[in-house]
Amino acid sequence: SYSNEMSVVADTIGGIDVAEAFHILHMDKRWTGKPAAMSTYVYPGCGYGGYCLPKDTNALYAVTKTAGFDAQILKNVIATNDHMPEFIADKIFRHIGDNKEQTIGILGLSFKPGSDDVRDTPSAKIVRELNRRGYNNIIGYDPVAIDEFKRKYTDLTISYVTSLDEVTTKADSLVITTAWPEFKDIDKKVNKPVVDCRYMN
């Protein structure tokens, strides 16, 4: 949540390379070794997702508040992550403008790479926010999670393609929402706007 908030801060202030800032942070020797593989958690993205982290954070906050303590960090962790889809939709708008006829390609549907788990995935929240703003020409691609996403999120206006080549060809702009390795350097391979919400490139 801190890293996501820092991406908003960097974007708001301007002139800050948030990816470089976090690469420098990760050079601290206290982040190395086992079991301290924390660098993947302390990096900006689309907000948390998956089954455990959102549920457990909300539960911990609720239990703590019921017990009489309004835990501000937990409260702000929830608020920051809940705000990310709106922030990312604003970022997409700044890159592609108000042309709602253009096709937006969503790169990644699972909540993390290496998994087909789409529970509480940021991709669904971002697509929902884009739909709410009138962007309905959306195509999604994921190496493994298309079927799961399609089954779970029937309320979204989105179609699907089965290859990276197809989404990069059909879309007018691309949005990276899951850090799959195959999306690395996609901005150098296509001549169209790429909104890198995972700060891979």
Where is each model-derived feature located?
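Structural/interface elements that position substrates and couple domains in central-metabolism enzymes
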Residues: 1-201
